[in-house]
């Protein structure tokens, strides 16, 4: 599923942006994750990405380490849930 591959890549780039202190790139990557997550109705992942997007837009990265942890936790929860579903026949 393209969502997971794309979100993993955006997540990796988001982490690089956070480490570099690049607020604009944080906003861009989080925005992409937010939109893709909304498209598949992944509410908690979308909300976590929204918080990161806002931090980037406001150029206030002081809370982003914690926000990124929340995002990763919610994304991992989504992956685990989907892995638990039976495969279609």
Question: Where does each model-flagged region fall?
Answer:
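Hydrophobic, amphipathic alpha-helical faces that serve as interaction scaffolds
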Residues: 48-57
């Amino acid at each position: 599923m393209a969502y997971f591959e794309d979100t993993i890549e955006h997540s990796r780039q988001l982490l690089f942006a956070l480490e570099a202190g690049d607020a604009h790139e944080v906003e861009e990557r989080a925005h992409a994750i937010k939109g893709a997550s909304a498209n598949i109705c992944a509410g908690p992942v979308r909300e976590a990405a929204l918080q990161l997007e806002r931090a980037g837009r406001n150029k206030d990265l002081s809370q982003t380490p914690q926000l990124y942890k929340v995002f990763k936790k919610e994304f991992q929860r989504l992956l685990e849930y989907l892995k638990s579903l039976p495969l279609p026949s």
